[in-house]
Amino acid sequence: MATATEIFERLKQDHDKHRALLDKLLDTSGDSNDREALFEELTKELKSHAAAEEQALYSTMLRKPPTTDETRHSVAEHHEIEEALNDLAATDMSSGGWLTKFKTFDHDYRHHIDEEEEDHFPDFAKYLDDKDMEHMERVFERRKREEKAEAEVTPEKKEDAKE
């Protein structure tokens, strides 16, 4: 039987992988093959994680009135993260502008996952029962696999993104 710590530990495992990819990307330079490959891996990982997290965790938390505001906040940040990834993908990796944007993205994304882990997950756990946990664990793993198979890098400048 799944427990609160299991689903949240699983999400934190993904976050740790994301932190490692961010660190590796910060160590790359210019329009290198390493930067391109790591950015593609990060993009697919983040997009699939966000979609699975929304379908497993956040859809459950939206049904719990005390956590609705926190949940909406996180989902809105997921949208901002995807826009930033698309903007980075549309920016020349060899330009100084790319690294500047990436450093801002790195800071914002780390803030997002720290907030989830330190504030939201402990709060959410108070409102979840074993049935919720089992459902979320099952949905997350299935959706993560499916979403990762479909995820792609989609270049789109922020100023061109539809609101």
What do these predicted ranges mean?
Residues 1-163:
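Small-residue-biased structural context
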